[in-house]
């Protein structure tokens, strides 16, 4: 049950961090450059998107702390790395971001995903029955 909580928390952290990245990108691309702040009124939707993205990062951190409570760091961190793939796919798929797919980006993201799968497959196969630093229930 604790491992399931860890996986759910890590997944929540990954999804929230991905949403935060997309929200920051969308909001910041619609705000004026800092040197123009004095002369322009910022778009409210963009400010709201940035504020929500910061909140999503905070929630992602809380999920991350919960994940670390129940999962080995290598396992949790590899899942968090999958957020790169999710952000890339969404940013290139959604017209609001004006991003594109490319062979080199897709290959790089594919390697990240392959790494996540490799790390988790090896750890599952070689997982010890008892972690030495934890007491048996």
From Swiss-Prot:
GO terms for molecular function: carbohydrate derivative transmembrane transporter activity. It is found in: Cell inner membrane. The chain crosses the membrane at residues 4-24, 45-65, 77-97, 101-121. Residues 25-44, 98-100 are periplasmic. InterPro entries: Flippase_ArnF, Small_drug/metabolite_transptr. Its main location: membrane. Residues 1-3, 66-76, 122-137 are cytoplasmic. Keywords: Cell inner membrane, Cell membrane, Lipid A biosynthesis, Lipid biosynthesis, Lipid metabolism, Lipopolysaccharide biosynthesis, Membrane, Transmembrane, Transmembrane helix, Transport. Pathway: Bacterial outer membrane biogenesis; lipopolysaccharide biosynthesis. GO terms for cellular component: plasma membrane. Gene3D superfamilies: 1.10.3730.20. It is a multi-pass membrane protein. The keyword Cell inner membrane applies. GO terms for biological process: lipid A biosynthetic process; lipopolysaccharide biosynthetic process. Translocates 4-amino-4-deoxy-L-arabinose-phosphoundecaprenol (alpha-L-Ara4N-phosphoundecaprenol) from the cytoplasmic to the periplasmic side of the inner membrane. Heterodimer of ArnE and ArnF. Belongs to the ArnF family. This is Probable 4-amino-4-deoxy-L-arabinose-phosphoundecaprenol flippase subunit ArnF. It comes from Pseudomonas aeruginosa (strain UCBPP-PA14). The gene is arnF.
């Amino acid at each position: 049950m604790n491992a399931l909580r860890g996986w759910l928390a890590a997944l929540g952290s990954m999804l929230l961090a991905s949403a935060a990245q997309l929200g920051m990108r969308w909001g910041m691309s619609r705000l004026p450059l800092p040197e123009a702040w004095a002369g322009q009124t910022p778009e409210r939707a963009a400010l709201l998107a940035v504020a929500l993205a910061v909140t999503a990062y905070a929630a992602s951190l809380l999920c991350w702390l919960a994940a670390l409570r129940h999962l080995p760091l290598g396992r949790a961190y590899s899942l968090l790395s999958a957020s790169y793939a999710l952000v890339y796919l969404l940013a290139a798929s959604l017209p609001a971001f004006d991003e594109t797919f490319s062979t080199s980006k897709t290959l790089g993201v594919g390697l990240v995903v392959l790494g996540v799968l490799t790390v988790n497959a090896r750890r599952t196969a070689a997982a010890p029955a008892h972690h030495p630093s934890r007491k048996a229930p």
